């Protein structure tokens, strides 16, 4: 095990045990007890959800927070929900993942030089986090950015993830520049990494064709090229 993976293991253990935000802690416990009808016989993860993937990643994919009955249930980001289904079909198509599905933590999924995480490690009620919760959780995301020494490209899924990623960068680097969220648009960050805006592969966006498989595939092909995967 490399020293970097040891650091990640320590970070992830800290994240899993985190109880900094009582509102979020209580909400994920409530979800895990009440469950969803189709998952009533499953044991929910019911804790903060860490990032996963290659610790030597050149590409990072970020969302805002785990899904209530996706990551919060399975214990892995973009796993066991429709957004994840759509995302991994695309990642497999462009040879970033070894399979086109992400069902549970034991499904054999592997990522090629890619790390997937959320800015907020717990699902917030109504998918709307408080600013204080984002601030408390931001150090975990900063730690992930710092640990991924080879990281070159960040793809932000959705405007909220994009905006909050920039908030963290603005705080860290004292940035004043304005960044517009536009699908496929890329920006150079102060640490020389590239940030790419991407529509979120939510069921609503997919069903209304705001985002299509072709659009996502094309974007990740570009992300691979920029990160030289």
Language model features: what each stretch is:
Residues 1:
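Cysteine-centered metal-binding/redox modules
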Residues 5-229:
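A polyanion-binding, active-site-adjacent surface
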């Amino acid at each position: 095990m490399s020293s970097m993976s040891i650091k990640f293991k320590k970070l992830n253990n800290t994240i899993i045990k985190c109880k900094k935000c009582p509102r979020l802690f209580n909400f994920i416990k409530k979800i895990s007890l009440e469950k969803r009808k189709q998952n009533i016989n499953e044991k929910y993860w019911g804790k903060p959800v860490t990032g996963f993937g290659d610790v030597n990643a050149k590409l990072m994919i970020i969302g805002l927070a785990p899904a209530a009955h996706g990551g919060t249930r399975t214990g892995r980001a973009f796993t066991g929900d429709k957004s994840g289904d759509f995302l991994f079909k695309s990642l497999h198509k462009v040879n970033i993942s070894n399979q086109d599905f992400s069902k549970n933590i034991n499904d054999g999924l592997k990522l090629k030089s890619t790390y997937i995480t959320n800015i907020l490690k717990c699902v917030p009620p109504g998918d709307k986090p408080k600013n204080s919760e984002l601030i408390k959780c931001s150090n975990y995301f900063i730690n992930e950015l710092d640990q991924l020494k080879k990281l070159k490209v960040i793809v932000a899924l959705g405007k909220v993830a994009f905006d909050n990623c920039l908030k963290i960068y603005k705080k860290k680097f004292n940035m004043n520049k304005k960044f517009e969220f536009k699908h496929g648009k890329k920006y150079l960050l102060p640490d020389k990494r590239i940030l790419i805006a991407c529509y979120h592969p939510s069921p609503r966006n997919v069903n209304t064709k705001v985002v299509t498989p072709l659009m996502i595939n094309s974007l990740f092909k570009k992300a691979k090229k920029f990160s030289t995967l």
